[in-house]
């Protein structure tokens, strides 16, 4: 699977005696857990984006000849939380995060998927609730990828090329989240260290609330209905 390079890895820093060191080496993920809050559809958009996240994580680790994090069900040092509409209340998020038995200080990154009727503000609000839940459980918030109208693109996510027209923005957003998770950094800090030229969200959000123009979504639905 061809992958587009997400962000350059943060550069090692140099100490006063001229010795290079990477101050985030100890924070690199070794055990990644997966939490799914949604419709539990095996081939739905949430499952597809999660699978793509883990595939990209493994691919970039191999390209850089670094450790491929182990996928675990408990005692994770990093959690990937996927949330789908209808967006869950805070108490549900808290309950599921407690169930993971994640290590103290574990980093949490979220993927929030909305349907056609879910606004960017609603998805941002959900990400904020997840952040609050993390802080109350003494987990470290890493940021979130928000994806709009995911169900309108469900078939494209399964069949279209990863960096083709229909999936490109979502794939690029996923790659940016992968870069942050692999670095053990919040999304905004990872982008700053990598020298990103795109605007940096102060709330550590990657906004793909409009993955394609609205008029092309109508075409996509027409194509899916005709070829179904």
What are these regions (language model features)?
Residues 1-13:
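N-terminal acidic, proline/glycine-rich, low-complexity intrinsically disordered segments
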Residues 16-25, 29-31, 53, 69-138:
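Helix-loop-strand module that forms the ligand-binding subsite of alpha/beta enzymes
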Residues 30-64:
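Short, charged N-terminal beta->alpha structural module
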Residues 36, 109-113, 146-147:
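Glycine- and acidic-rich phosphate- and metal-coordinating loops
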Residues 58-67, 140-145:
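Short beta-strand elements in bilobed, periplasmic/extracellular small-molecule ligand-binding domains
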Residues 68-71, 145-150, 187-198:
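Acidic carboxylate-rich catalytic motifs and surrounding loops in phosphoryl-/glycosyl-chemistry enzymes
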Residues 125-186:
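Active-site/pore-lining binding-face segments in mid-to-C-terminal subdomains
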Residues 168-228:
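C-terminal and late-domain segments of enzyme folds
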């Amino acid at each position: 699977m061809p992958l587009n390079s997400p962000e350059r890895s943060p550069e090692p820093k140099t100490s006063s005696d001229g010795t290079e060191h990477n101050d985030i080496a100890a924070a690199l993920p070794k055990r990644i857990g997966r939490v799914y809050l949604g419709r539990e559809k095996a081939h739905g958009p949430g499952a597809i984006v999660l699978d793509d996240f883990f595939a990209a994580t493994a691919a970039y680790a191999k390209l850089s000849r670094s450790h491929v994090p182990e996928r675990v069900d408990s005692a994770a040092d990093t959690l990937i939380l996927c949330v789908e509409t209808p967006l869950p209340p805070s108490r549900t998020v808290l309950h599921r995060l407690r169930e993971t038995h994640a290590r103290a200080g574990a980093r949490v990154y979220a993927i929030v998927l909305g349907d056609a009727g879910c606004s960017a503000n609603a998805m941002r609000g959900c990400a904020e609730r997840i952040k609050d839940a993390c802080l109350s459980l003494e987990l470290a918030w890493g940021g979130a990828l928000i994806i709009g109208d995911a169900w309108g693109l469900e078939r494209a996510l399964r069949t279209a090329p990863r960096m083709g027209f229909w999936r490109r923005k979502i794939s690029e957003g996923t790659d940016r989240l992968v870069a942050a998770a692999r670095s053990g950094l919040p999304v905004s800090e990872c982008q700053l260290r990598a020298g990103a030229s795109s605007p940096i969200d102060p709330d550590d959000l990657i906004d793909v609330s409009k993955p394609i123009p609205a008029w092309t979504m109508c075409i996509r639905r027409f194509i899916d209905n005709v070829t179904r």
